[in-house]
């Protein structure tokens, strides 16, 4: 089964130890600022040479997920792509599958950092345009990718990308289907919105 990177939560101890003023200042400088982008709709784009890197947790992925990631890296690494100015762009990968057991449509993608800063703690919402037309009589809902941390993204530099698998839950899934279905990702158009991240200074 492909490892879907959607339900990812971070936890921490709120009772942080006290540090001196110098250390506190250093911490703020490293944290950077929090950025929120409502949508990419209507924003200018430009063509950019991008570099796509394997995610840091590659050693812990199963072979199937690793293969999907490697295919998308091969597809997009060192290529010129149209990306949204000063935002996050999603490029659709080659893997697409309807999983009747989990009642979801999964597809691979590459997240591109189109900003001028290194970033971390990235989260966003995704939706499929005309999701009711992907598979007849099925509707797939929006979903949220929660805080991809630096441990998951690595050094997420400008004009670089990392692979991901997105999952869209089926509305009113019955579990009646017994067989999965491969999806032609060329027919998918995915929108990204409510983007949030922190810059790394």
Predicted regions and their residues:
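Sec-dependent N-terminal signal peptides
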Residues: 1-4
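C-terminal motif of bacterial Sec signal peptides marking the signal peptidase cleavage site
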Residues: 6-10
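Membrane engagement elements in two modes
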Residues: 11-106, 162, 168-201
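Short, well-ordered beta-strand segments enriched in hydrophobic/aromatic residues
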Residues: 105-113
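The feature marks short-to-medium sequence segments in extracytoplasmic or secretory-pathway proteins
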Residues: 112, 116-158
């Amino acid at each position: 089964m492909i490892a879907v990177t959607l339900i990812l939560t971070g936890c921490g101890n709120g009772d942080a130890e006290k540090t001196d003023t110098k250390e506190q200042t250093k911490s703020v400088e490293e944290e950077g600022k929090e950025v929120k982008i409502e949508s990419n709709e209507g924003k200018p784009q430009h063509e950019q040479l991008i570099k796509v890197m394997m995610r840091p947790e590659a050693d812990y992925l199963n072979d199937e997920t690793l293969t999907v990631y490697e295919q998308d890296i091969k597809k997009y690494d060192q290529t010129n792509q149209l990306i949204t100015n000063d935002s996050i762009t999603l490029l659709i990968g080659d893997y697409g599958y309807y999983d009747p057991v989990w009642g979801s449509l999964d597809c691979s993608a590459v997240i591109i950092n189109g900003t001028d800063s290194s970033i971390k703690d990235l989260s966003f919402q995704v939706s499929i345009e005309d999701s009711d037309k992907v598979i007849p009589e099925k509707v797939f809902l929006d979903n949220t990718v929660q805080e991809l941390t630096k441990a998951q993204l690595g050094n997420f530099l400008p004009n670089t990308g990392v692979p991901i698998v997105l999952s869209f839950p089926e509305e009113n899934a019955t579990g009646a289907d017994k067989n999965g279905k491969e999806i032609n990702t060329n027919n998918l158009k995915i929108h990204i919105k409510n983007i949030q991240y922190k810059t790394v200074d």
